[in-house]
């Protein structure tokens, strides 16, 4: 078992019954010229987040944790995005940006596009699971819940973008399904002002889960590995 120092208190978990979830580390969300950038959100400080996710993934994989990668987006016809009868049609900033800038139509979050692809620095490995998702929450219209339950996984460690949107949405839905959710704060990034990051982390540690950081996470896993060897 591994005990992770976190806010508001430490949490103990079995790495082999825990998944590291990497949320939407796509060009759309982390690269200049991607959807968030074109929609007016600041992505200039995402490089350290990418590096921290690399570190967390390496440590988690070495500890025997399942790695799950999410990619947010839709089919080329945007049927999966929902039409005017869906609130997603009205609230998705990607869809609104394409309606406001017709030259971008078909380029944002389209499966198979550069925008949809994971950033070059973060590549899934054999044994990892890559899941497409059509909405903010990774539990909506995906097999995530059945994958986790079939493997006896009850603890989820979250990284990725955006903390206040897809990360928090997935963690909240997991909370309602009886999963224990931990966010590594320096391996996440918000969409919007810095206060959005702080507010999301406050919500998580106060109401829905736990908050830690990459160095603490890696140290905890390393200590567990040494204990097994001894």
Curated annotation (Swiss-Prot):
EC class (word): hydrolase
Catalytic activity of the protein: (Z)-3-ureidoacrylate + H2O + H(+) = (Z)-3-aminoacrylate + NH4(+) + CO2; (Z)-3-ureidoacrylate + H2O = (Z)-3-aminoacrylate + carbamate + H(+); (Z)-2-methylureidoacrylate + H2O + H(+) = (Z)-2-methylaminoacrylate + NH4(+) + CO2
GO biological process: nitrogen utilization; uracil catabolic process
Keywords: Hydrolase
Top-level taxonomic group: Bacteria
Alphabetical list of SUPFAM superfamilies matching this protein: Isochorismatase-like hydrolases
GO molecular function: hydrolase activity, acting on carbon-nitrogen (but not peptide) bonds, in linear amides
Keyword Hydrolase (UniProt): yes
Induction profile: Up-regulated by the nitrogen regulatory protein C (NtrC also called GlnG) and repressed by RutR.
InterPro entries in alphabetical order: Isochorismatase-like_dom, Isochorismatase-like_hydrls, Isochorismatase-like_sf, RutB
Catalytic residues of the enzyme: 24 (proton acceptor), 133, 166 (nucleophile)
The UniProt record lists the keyword Chloroplast: no
EC number of this enzyme: 3.5.1.110
HAMAP family: RutB (MF_00830)
Family of the protein in this entry: Belongs to the isochorismatase family. RutB subfamily.
Biological role: Hydrolyzes ureidoacrylate to form aminoacrylate and carbamate. The carbamate hydrolyzes spontaneously, thereby releasing one of the nitrogen atoms of the pyrimidine ring as ammonia and one of its carbon atoms as CO2.
Protein known as: Ureidoacrylate amidohydrolase RutB
Lineage per the UniProt record: Bacteria, Pseudomonadati, Pseudomonadota, Gammaproteobacteria, Enterobacterales
């Amino acid at each position: 078992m591994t005990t992770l120092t976190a806010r508001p208190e430490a949490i103990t978990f079995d790495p082999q019954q825990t998944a590291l979830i990497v949320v939407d580390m796509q060009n759309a969300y982390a690269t200049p010229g991607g959807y968030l950038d074109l929609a007016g959100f600041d992505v200039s400080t995402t490089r350290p987040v990418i590096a921290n996710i690399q570190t967390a993934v390496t440590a988690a994989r070495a500890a025997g944790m399942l790695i799950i990668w999410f990619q947010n987006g839709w089919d080329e016809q945007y049927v999966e995005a929902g039409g005017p009868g869906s609130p997603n049609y009205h609230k998705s900033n990607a869809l609104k940006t394409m309606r406001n800038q017709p030259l971008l139509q078909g380029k944002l979050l389209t499966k198979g596009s550069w925008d949809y692809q994971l950033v070059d620095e973060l590549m899934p490995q054999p044994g990892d699971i890559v899941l497409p998702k059509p909405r903010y929450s990774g539990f909506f219209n995906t097999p995530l819940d059945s994958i986790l339950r079939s493997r006896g996984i009850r603890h989820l460690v979250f990284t990725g973008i955006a903390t206040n949107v897809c990360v928090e949405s997935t963690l909240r839905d997991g909370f309602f399904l009886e999963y224990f959710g931990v966010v590594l704060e320096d391996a996440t990034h918000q969409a919007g002002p810095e206060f959005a990051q702080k507010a999301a982390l406050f919500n998580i540690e106060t109401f829905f889960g736990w908050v830690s950081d990459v160095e603490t996470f890696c140290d905890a896993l390393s200590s567990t590995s040494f204990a097994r060897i001894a």
